[in-house]
Amino acid sequence: MLSPVLLLLAQAAAPPPPAGDVIVVGHRAEQELARCLARNCPPAEEVDASLEASVEQFADGRYTDARRTLQTAIRRNRNYAAELPGPVSSLYATLATVAEHEGDTDLWRTAARNNVLVLRRHLGETNLATLREELSFADSLVGLGAPGAANSAYRTIQQRAAGSGHPGIAAGAAFRRAWLALLRDRFKEAQRFADEAVSLAGTDNRLMADLRELLRTRIAIRKGDEGAIEALAARLRQSADVQPQLLFAPPVADINPPPPPFGVHLNPWHDSRIRFADAGYWIRANGQTAEVEVLRTSGLDQWGPGILRQVRERRYVPLDVEPGHPGIYRIDRFTVRGAMDVPTGSHLRQRMGDLTVHVVDLTETDAMREARRRQTAATSAVKGS
């Protein structure tokens, strides 16, 4: 699971989502995919229909169905990657997200890697779409517990992007290096990378300047200044029409059972079930959350209070809106699962280790679809030039 600021920066590079999107889960996309396959539709249509259906299945909590839909689409259409690099790479990117929430770390890593390889091969290493997905892959390495490999990847991306005329990507990579340094309490190094990020983005780039202030605030908090978040929130304002900027989010309370003094502990949660909860909440004008509630849960009753507490204690950049504005409504999916692995003395994969929490913003689903369409159009323009 990405740290909140890495997730924020990944979202900040994307176009803002349409205001007011609310997810309605049904089976329309699955039916469209079935009709598409029945008439032997062209690869471009099949890929798009498969992506739509997988997002629908994921939102409905049917992670296995979503994975199978994507894997089938990849097998049928990967040979069309030269003509459809953006759509085929999106199949892998979406599969990586599903695999993360399913707990299949090998598939998560492989799918995230293949997403990048498709774009490298067919668009080139310095193409903007490729560099964006390189950042996403490095973010996945953080979530997979490989911060050293992620830092090396960020450094390479920063150099490549700066040398090919993509300062925004270079700045994003530099800031991620700053955040990793902060997590290791290397405050001077973190500040240096944050300064590099602002320099690369340009001094008139408000987002990167705000992110640097956020990093400075987190340094102050680590040094004992608990009022730093309130001071920063008082200085910042953002439009209600753009992606909400997260200032602070505590971890979800850990309810993993304590390890036994002797013997092997078998966690009763380590089974094949998918456990998730969808939390709905408002981000008010002052940047605080309100009316936080669990909209739907599947086997996460014990984790419910911790999830609600985590969302209630978040702090976002205050909104620049008229008095009385209700704010922004969001829905987050929380998945709790152990990773799939093969224990010693067995040949069967099963869930092992501590349970971890993985979060994705369901409010972005429609925006993700629209962004994919824009990426496909941009890819077509590059190939046609």
Residue ranges and their predicted role:
Residues 14-139, 143-385:
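Charge-biased low-complexity segments
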